[in-house]
Amino acid sequence: MAITAAQVKELRDRTGAGMMDCKNALTETDGDIELAIDNMRKSGAAKAAKKAGNIAADGTILIKNGEGFAALLEVNCQTDFVAKDSNFLAFANAVLDVAAASKVSIEDLKAQFEETRVALVTKIGENINVRRVEYIDGANLASYRHGDRIGVVVAGEADEETLKHIAMHVAASKPDFVNPEDVPAELVEREQALQIEIAMNEGKPAEIAEKMVVGRMKKFTGEISLTGQAFIMEPKKTVGEVLKSKGATVTSFIRLEVGEGIEKKAEDFAAEVAAQIAATKKA
């Protein structure tokens, strides 16, 4: 049976697949579009399963406000080229819309968009992963995105400009906690034990070592907490001092960065080029 251009166009419109893929699928089914779609979906699932082992450490961070909260979403792909692809971004934004509508869990988001994800993996040719979603509550929220790779939302009692500046600070300085006193006791105890050992190894008398450790611990908890850090816009003041001068407070924040915690495969380009040259010589 001859496959017409109209049939190929219809299949492309319905699946988003390439022209030759559509033509081949229709040829295999003697022009049966519905069967071709079924076969392409099966083939897509198989391809997606093969791609699942590929490391997806690139991607985008998106932010959207809901009713009294904000949603932050990370969707991953394998390359920065695909991270800018309109189809990839449309998929990520569709997931975000659902998340921001009713605080949908990451498990439910993945399940709801799995079929769409598989189709996109087939079309683009890279592993794609809806990795994580975070929600932050607050009547006063300010967000900041640094490019497509870092997203921050801050909640607190302050004017919008102040919270925006704090969000920018969080993006740059990566605090782990809001206040020094929020640092967990076990983390403080572990660091304190380490600092005592370091001071003793330096041969300091016990009294001096103790005072040194007190100072070092204050510095430690300050450096990993938002209000204890030097404010990037006024380095001579801490964030806490800036907030106090404005009668403002920060209650919570969330910071997401693309690929955090994902172990990326190290690429040795020199070795890759050498291997290509060797292969050429053999040929």
Swiss-Prot record:
Keywords: Cytoplasm, Elongation factor, Protein biosynthesis. GO terms for cellular component: cytoplasm. It comes from the Bacteria. It is found in: Cytoplasm. Signal peptide: none annotated. The keyword Protein biosynthesis applies. GO terms for molecular function: translation elongation factor activity. InterPro entries: EF-Ts_dimer_sf, Transl_elong_EFTs/EF1B, Transl_elong_EFTs/EF1B_dimer, Transl_elong_Ts_CS, UBA-like_sf. Residues 79-82 are annotated as: Involved in Mg(2+) ion dislocation from EF-Tu. Associates with the EF-Tu.GDP complex and induces the exchange of GDP to GTP. It remains bound to the aminoacyl-tRNA.EF-Tu.GTP complex up to the GTP hydrolysis stage on the ribosome. HAMAP family: EF_Ts. Belongs to the EF-Ts family. This is Elongation factor Ts. It comes from Shewanella frigidimarina (strain NCIMB 400).
